[in-house]
Amino acid sequence: LELAAAHPTQMDGLIVESGFAYAEPLLGLLGVDVKRLGFKEDQGFGNLDKVRHYAGPTLIIHAEHDHIIPFTDGQALYDASGAAHKRLLRIEGANHNDIFAQGLASYMQAIQGLVAHIRGL
């Protein structure tokens, strides 16, 4: 997301796997006392804003049962995406650490579809 936001015209497409929309819950899960630090979401990474301003083809892949970054974060990124051509792929039954193994076929098909779209096939 950082590269897509910084260099949107140099990116032909964007793939986000297990991306987070909100920094505060993730930091808390990682043991950061966000309240003690006075952390506010608008001081975070701004991933929703970044994805909102990227208009290129976008594929968001997220595990249905992600125990680190909830599927709702992937949905939020998809909903905020400014792309006309976008897809949210939910990998059924997968969690954060086995997303690729659980969804190999659909994962690869989605990437092939994005590449085909970019290449105009």
List PLM regions with ranges:
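Hydrolase active-site cap/lid region
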Residues: 1-56
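Catalytic active-site module of serine/aspartate enzymes centered on a nucleophile-bearing elbow/loop
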Residues: 102-121
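Structured catalytic core of nucleotide-sugar glycosyltransferases
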Residues: 8, 17, 73-75, 88, ...
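Short beta-strand/loop motif that positions the catalytic acidic residue
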Residues: 53-55, 59-66
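Hydrophobic/aromatic beta-strand patches that form the interior of the parallel beta-sheet core
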Residues: 15, 59-61, 89
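Short alpha-helix in the alpha/beta-hydrolase fold that links the catalytic acid
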Residues: 47, 56, 70-79, 104
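Catalytic histidine-centered segment of alpha/beta-hydrolase-like enzymes
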Residues: 68, 94-108
